[in-house]
Amino acid sequence: MKQLVCVLFVCSSAVTQLHKDPTLDHHWNLWKKTYGKQYKEKNEEAVRRLIWEKNLKFVMLHNLEHSMGMHSYDLGMNHLGDMTSEEVMSLMSSLRVPNQWQRNITYKSNPNQMLPDSVDWREKGCVTEVKYQGSCGACWAFSAVGALEAQLKLKTGKLVSLSAQNLVDCSEKYGNKGCNGGFMTEAFQYIIDNKGIDSEASYPYKATDQKCQYDSKYRAATCSKYTELPYGREDVLKEAVANKGPVCVGVDASHPSFFLYRSGVYYDPACTQKVNHGVLVIGYGDLNGKEYWLVKNSWGSNFGEQGYIRMARNKGNHCGIASYPSYPEI
């Protein structure tokens, strides 16, 4: 992560000699004010300005094509608009997928059952507010606690935000690397063995690696087991989301079209099945004939549709969304 930032700013003296577009000065200042952007040095601001202009051009051209019916989603200059794809991946998307042989597929599907046409677990009060992971690759932790929060609500009737920081700090021996990445099933195994996880209120998120501070006095949830779904089976993922609750998944989030997504059903042919970002499927549905997965992200409410993204469903496991699904049980 540090190497990437260094590369960007070693080049800053050369970048400052490139010309910004002065006609965008007002819009640049407005964008900075909107998202509270402040830069320590002029060279840093010069770098960010040129990245921002490049992203702005990308957004404008994409949205022009969207207006012509060429895309099912549009883009916007959100709080990530001054970052490159490489930075977003390095700072905010660090999913570490375990070796394939370690997976234990235990889900028993019932292909003959009738499932609802749409599901949104927010409507049942099973989804906490969207969180912001900041410059820490803790996507996996937020995905894991999001799934467990829903199970806690279904079992007890109480919706409680659980501590992603607890997972960041305490699950290293399970293969997780804190802000440098991890995986949801390893997080569940830690909670199982630890006999619990603290609440967010008692163990708040700091977006950095710390010494483990778990305290059983503040335990807010437990986990008895977790279930993994078969690779690439969107039909089984639909069944699990409908019957069990929100499901943890990994996706390919490495494209500007993803981190600058604003609304609609996301479908980018460049998206691969090499997953690098942990998110939470909280439902599914159909928008103007486009089937989608309703996905909760951890990039704050300024991302997408108030922190959510609708991703193409039944499009050949688009972005790898059905590659590594799992959910916990209490």
From Swiss-Prot:
CC per GO annotation: extracellular space; lysosome; phagocytic vesicle
Catalytic activity: Similar to cathepsin L, but with much less activity on Z-Phe-Arg-|-NHMec, and more activity on the Z-Val-Val-Arg-|-Xaa compound
InterPro entries: Papain-like_cys_pep_sf, Pept_asp_AS, Pept_cys_AS, Pept_his_AS, Peptidase_C1A, Peptidase_C1A_C, Peptidase_C1A_papain-like, Prot_inhib_I29
GO MF: cysteine-type endopeptidase activity
Keyword Nucleotide-binding: no
Keywords carried by this UniProt record: Cytoplasmic vesicle, Disulfide bond, Glycoprotein, Hydrolase, Lysosome, Protease, Secreted, Signal, Thiol protease, Zymogen
Propeptide span(s): 18-114
GO biological process: antigen processing and presentation of exogenous peptide antigen via MHC class II; proteolysis
Glycoprotein is among the record's keywords: yes
EC number from the UniProt entry: 3.4.22.27
Signal peptide: 1-17
Biological role: Thiol protease. Key protease responsible for the removal of the invariant chain from MHC class II molecules and MHC class II antigen presentation. The bond-specificity of this proteinase is in part similar to the specificities of cathepsin L.
Protein name, entry field: Cathepsin S
Species of provenance: Saimiri boliviensis boliviensis (Bolivian squirrel monkey)
